[in-house]
């Protein structure tokens, strides 16, 4: 199939340039003004911005095992609606992808249902228990984007050391959910701060995150493993990672839109404000923003975690942990970081597209020769975040009702038109 994106605006070295993008059989074959390119599908992108498709290295697509929350079909459609062309799917599934046979179940669903590039993680431990026998990383590494027990921390230094050694031998990456449950009281639901104390809710202390990061940095220094920290939320974590990078440790990390735009001051006793790790203090939020700007935090990942409406209807105490975010990430960050002057647009695109591609060795982009990974946005939109417009099964977002000034109009992934809200000439 031949596709032409006509008269879109591309940001190059700080300047907008009107550009056509020609795609043939899923590959970018030409870029330039007024291209002569006979195409089966021509999309008029005049007035819209063209970006490399976004990459999220931390999403929960829930299938196999929990299709009442999300499916590969609904989740990948939601990703395309958010401008994403590649996502890495976490392994807290049933069965957990801890063997060739179990991984094949997820791969078959991806092959049959995904409208974008979905890359599975395998679990670090058998059954994704955070302890005990490790998965056969050497056998699985060629079929996965990395290894994670996300949703659980790896419990002991001995288990993590062995995992790092095997991961390094397999030339893969560990994406670590850093959470030491020994720090968390029964019923821990939100940050151990003023809101928790005022409302009598058991709190989750910052130590539960930064202590295992501190442990793993030492192990990473020892083993040389490629290591990535998921959903960083505390100022101590940022400081530890900044120092480790200065020492040459092979470490990267991510944070999420909700940690950049919200803190515990914004909490309401609603399930849509409950996620793990929780919203922290204002000084944690400020440290995350500083880390994002100085490169300590390499990328933005949504930790898109859909649940059923019933599971999110029990307030902060009783609701399941997790919020959705894949459809709102760029509109929110563009509106509240770029338009407010807190962050250049080029940096936001790097943190959402280029940096995760580099670290996780993911092909695709907008240059000639790339596998086509392009998203088209209207940066003059005036919309309010409305969960009823989501393609995800999950609707729990702390940003419901927020005004945003960006809207996805088209997403192209390889030879697929993954999302289309443009009028089309044929």
Name each region found by the language model.
Residues 64, 89-115, 122-144, 152-156, ...:
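Active-site loop-to-helix "anion-binding N-cap" substructures in soluble metabolic enzymes
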Residues 132-300:
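Histidine/acidic residue-rich metal-binding segments in metalloenzymes
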Residues 1-53:
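Histidine-rich, glycine-flanked metal-binding segment
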Residues 100-117, 166-176, 328:
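Alpha-helix-loop-beta-strand connector modules within alpha/beta enzyme cores
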Residues 8, 26, 47, 58, ...:
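Divalent metal-coordination and catalytic microenvironments
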Residues 8, 315-318, 368-426:
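C-terminal cap of metal-dependent C-N hydrolases
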Residues 198-226, 293-294, 298-300, 305-377:
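His/Asp/Glu-enriched, well-ordered alpha-helical/loop segment
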Residues 46-113:
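Metal-associated gating/positioning segment near the N- to mid-region
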